[in-house]
Amino acid sequence: MALSIECQQRPEKVNPRALRREGLIPATLYGHNGAESISLVVDHKTAITMLRSVTVKETPIEVKIPHLSWEGEAVVQEIQCHPWRRNLYHLAFFAGKK
């Protein structure tokens, strides 16, 4: 089963708490262009559904960023959650070589 997720570029100067209240999760994509990173947002429900079938640092995911015309394979590098509420706070993706 191939996993894929569509991300949007995160607007600048927007508080991550405000994004979470709107049902979006802040995310970051590393490794797609050397040391450069991109700040992204992902739909909360889509992220939760995807994370049910993902193993961190192992499962390849097709990441699509339509705004930047970028598409590639990545793995979930890190998942940040609230310690006892288990609310999703942040995702980090690491892009592999094409």
From Swiss-Prot:
Biological-process GO terms, alphabetical: translation
Annotated Gene Ontology cellular component terms: ribonucleoprotein complex; ribosome
Domain of life of the source: Bacteria
Molecular function (Gene Ontology), one example: 5S rRNA binding
InterPro entries assigned to the protein according to its UniProt record, in alphabetical order: Rbsml_bL25/Gln-tRNA_synth_N (IPR020056), Ribosomal_bL25/Gln-tRNA_synth (IPR011035), Ribosomal_bL25_short (IPR020055), Ribosomal_L25_dom (IPR029751)
UniProt keyword list: Ribonucleoprotein, Ribosomal protein, RNA-binding, rRNA-binding
Pfam families assigned: Ribosomal_L25p
HAMAP family the record matches: Ribosomal_bL25
Family: Belongs to the bacterial ribosomal protein bL25 family.
Oligomeric form and interacting partners: Part of the 50S ribosomal subunit; part of the 5S rRNA/L5/L18/L25 subcomplex. Contacts the 5S rRNA. Binds to the 5S rRNA independently of L5 and L18.
Role description: This is one of the proteins that binds to the 5S RNA in the ribosome where it forms part of the central protuberance.
Protein name in UniProt: Large ribosomal subunit protein bL25
Organism, scientific name: Synechocystis sp. (strain ATCC 27184 / PCC 6803 / Kazusa)
Organismal lineage: Bacteria, Bacillati, Cyanobacteriota, Cyanophyceae, Synechococcales
